[in-house]
């Protein structure tokens, strides 16, 4: 049996915010991208245990989560995210919040066919900025109101 070779370069996607007119390509292996991690934050099951040990499972609705985008601190992608963040903060500080959670992200890994769509995306905060002898990677953390993965 032969395995399938993984390549981050087979990741293709896009980040868009139609309110502010931003389109940022997300392509693995390009533009200083170091990695992407998707994390669901809603537990889908809760269990209540009665005094006699009877377990009552409950299904919990929700599809929200987080997305970490790790980039080189001098990358084009970092600059694009920083520009979008600053634009949205400036608008929000002027009471224009229409664009704050209007970002959408979709990407696919061509090798295995997995597709992820995130909507209602907003920035958690500006990432920490390291200053060291050598350039570093920084991680942008975004929150998504809805994540679908196929």
Q: How would you label these PLM feature ranges?
A:
Residues 1-76, 113-141, 149:
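Solvent-exposed edge beta-strands and adjacent loop segments
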Residues 76-82:
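Short, conserved charged micro-motifs
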Residues 83-117:
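Short, acidic/charged, Gly/Pro-enriched secondary-structure junctions
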């Amino acid at each position: 049996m032969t395995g399938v070779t993984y390549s981050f370069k087979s990741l293709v996607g896009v980040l868009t915010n139609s309110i502010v007119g931003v389109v940022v390509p997300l392509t693995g292996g390009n533009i200083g991208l170091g990695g992407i991690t998707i994390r669901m934050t809603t537990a889908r099951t809760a269990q209540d245990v009665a005094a006699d040990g009877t377990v009552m499972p409950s299904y919990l609705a929700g599809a929200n989560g987080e997305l970490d985008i790790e980039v080189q601190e001098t990358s084009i992608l970092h600059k694009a995210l920083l520009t979008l963040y600053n634009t949205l903060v400036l608008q929000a500080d002027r009471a224009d919040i229409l664009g704050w959670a209007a970002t959408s992200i979709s990407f696919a890994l061509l090798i295995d066919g997995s597709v992820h769509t995130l909507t209602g995306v907003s920035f958690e905060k500006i990432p920490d900025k390291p200053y060291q002898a050598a350039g570093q990677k920084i991680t942008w953390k975004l929150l998504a109101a809805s994540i679908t993965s196929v």
